[in-house]
């Protein structure tokens, strides 16, 4: 199953009780993904600081250039849409099979593999940004790159077994001219 939502609060992913409980036990179950990650000055391993900065559109490129993405509002303050959360969930029966004593450990690997393949397809085929053409009109151009994080959880909010992966797609992409802009 797949559900989607806007990322509206960084702390939801980092501080929620059930997220924190699962993350303490499963430190290797989170990672950055997407081809844009290679152009950014971040550790390939997941960490809270890089996750927070990517959500807020505060990016340092591998060349050391600092970029702050967003649009200025009427008060002159920068506003940035953090991105999207795509949540890939295994069926309940599969989650139970995986999490029971002596459960099949291949299930989590299969969930990660399927999620990564789907995310790669989305990145290649559905990643766009806006650009002004010579006449000043705004048009969409395909970029084929983004940055994301994969956060595995085995519990839902009710602390029931529910294997799922949150794919947070950050609101940033690299245009063909090399500039990093919002999706």
Give the role of each language-model region.
Residues 1-163, 168-183:
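Intrinsically disordered, flexible peripheral segments
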């Amino acid at each position: 199953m797949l559900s989607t939502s806007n990322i509206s609060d960084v702390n939801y992913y980092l501080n929620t009780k059930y997220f924190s409980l699962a993350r303490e036990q499963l430190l290797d179950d989170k990672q950055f993904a997407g081809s844009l990650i290679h152009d950014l000055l971040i550790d390939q391993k997941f960490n809270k600081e890089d996750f927070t900065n990517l959500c807020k559109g505060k990016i340092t490129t591998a060349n050391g250039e600092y970029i702050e993405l967003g649009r200025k509002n009427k008060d002159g303050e920068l506003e940035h849409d953090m991105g999207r959360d795509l949540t890939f969930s295994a069926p309940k029966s599969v989650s139970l099979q995986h999490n029971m004593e002596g459960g099949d450990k291949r299930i989590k690997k299969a969930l990660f593999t399927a999620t990564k393949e789907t995310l790669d397809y989305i990145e290649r085929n559905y990643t766009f940004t806006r650009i002004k053409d010579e006449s000043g009109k705004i048009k969409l151009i395909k970029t084929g790159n983004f940055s994301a994080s994969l956060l595995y959880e085995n519990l839902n909010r009710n602390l029931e077994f529910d294997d799922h992966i949150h794919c947070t797609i950050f609101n940033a992409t690299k245009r063909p001219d090399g500039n990093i802009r919002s999706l």
